[in-house]
A protein has these predicted regions:
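A short, polar/proline- and glycine-enriched secondary-structure boundary/capping micro-motif
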Residues: 89-94, 146-147, 157-159
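Residues forming well-ordered secondary-structure scaffolds
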Residues: 105, 122, 143, 160-167
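Short acidic, Gly/Pro-enriched loop/turn segments at secondary-structure junctions
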Residues: 37-39, 155-159
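N-terminal strand-loop-strand beta-hairpin
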Residues: 23-131, 172-189
């Protein structure tokens, strides 16, 4: 577990420090949350610790391959391109992150060049246990959702992370049949 977290941190430090493109992978499971408080209590009983709450503004741009978004929050901004592969409610994502020093200018440029597909604003409470993060998301105009995310070290088989996430979902009392496999903005389309 420590090895996975160290690998993830190393990739993020390279991205933050040098502005280079960093390819990463994760396994995700997203689900509606009728009772975020109960899920948070169960997660904390499993050893998850709250690391903070963020206000995030995501602008999705029109692209022909995958999804491209500019994520802005108080401590920084990132351009994120990702491609998802769905399997039984779990999503394997291949993604690239580039830190952005001038998000307003980039958002204006990308909006003019590509067009805006959607905007999503959310308040995200982040809980973490080893290499697995639990997001409790209050999404404007969409509701409350949870998302489990496990970052994969290079070369690791995603099957082990899917197994871990499935066990956590069961402990949180989230049925696999409730998993959703779309971005928040796609829920109303």
């Amino acid at each position: 577990l420590a090895r996975r977290e160290a690998a993830r941190q190393q990739r993020l430090e390279v991205a933050r420090g040098h502005g280079r493109r960093v390819a990463m992978r994760n396994v995700e499971a997203k689900f509606p949350l009728p009772d975020a408080g109960a899920v948070r209590q169960r997660a904390e009983a499993l050893g998850f610790e709250c690391t903070g709450t963020l206000i995030q503004h995501d602008t999705f741009f029109v692209v022909s391959n995958g999804k491209l978004k500019l994520r802005e929050q108080r401590d920084g901004a990132w351009l994120i391109h990702y491609r998802r592969h769905h399997e039984k409610g779990f999503e394997l994502s291949d993604y690239d992150i580039v830190p952005v020093s001038e998000p307003l200018k980039l958002r204006q440029l990308m909006s003019a060049a590509l067009g805006v597909l959607a905007r999503v604003r959310k308040r995200r409470t982040l809980l973490q246990r080893a290499h697995i993060r639990l997001h409790l998301d209050h999404v404007d105009n969409h509701g409350v959702f949870g998302e489990l995310e496990a970052v994969l070290p290079e070369g690791e088989d995603p099957a082990s992370c899917r197994t871990e996430i499935a066990a956590i979902l069961a402990a949180l009392q989230i049925p696999v049949g409730q998993l959703i496999d779309v971005s928040y903005f796609e829920l109303t389309r």
